[in-house]
């Protein structure tokens, strides 16, 4: 009998007017059961200047965070280069290629979505979303960006709340981070 699928998360990052915020919900589901309600799937890196969040396997994501931190050390202050180098290694390394996670990384200048199949996307509108409720959070964030002057933190909170009201694999126990100055 196959193990039930672990479904975890909605992660959203928003950049606007020289500010950035990233957030994630707290739900982890195993099959059709909520296994955890207050998981934290976002963190700060590089002394608080870089924000990161993951969807997918926790162990795989932690491995990728370590690899990404190595890239940030090798290319200090250059989030685009560190992201490209991680995407290249993730895609070409036999072990890393099997990791089942997606990452969002962002600072005040750039934001990227990375995946193991070689995807490296920097959106035009400064909105990045991954995970089971990602499309709902992205749609809500786009509407809030177009129709309000809210700062990124508020957009992330409100959009993730909306996603949590729609997606059964997303809740409203939200963690939001901003870079430290």
Swiss-Prot record:
GO terms for cellular component: HslUV protease complex; proteasome core complex. HAMAP family: HslV. A double ring-shaped homohexamer of HslV is capped on each side by a ring-shaped HslU homohexamer. The assembly of the HslU/HslV complex is dependent on binding of ATP. This is ATP-dependent protease subunit HslV. It is an enzyme of class 3 (hydrolase). Protease subunit of a proteasome-like degradation complex believed to be a general protein degrading machinery. Pfam families: Proteasome (PF00227). Belongs to the peptidase T1B family. HslV subfamily. It catalyses: ATP-dependent cleavage of peptide bonds with broad specificity. PANTHER family: ATP-DEPENDENT PROTEASE SUBUNIT HSLV, METALLOPROTEASE TLDD. It comes from the Bacteria. Keywords: Allosteric enzyme, Cytoplasm, Hydrolase, Metal-binding, Protease, Sodium, Threonine protease. Na(+) binds at residues 164, 167, 170. The keyword Iron does not apply.
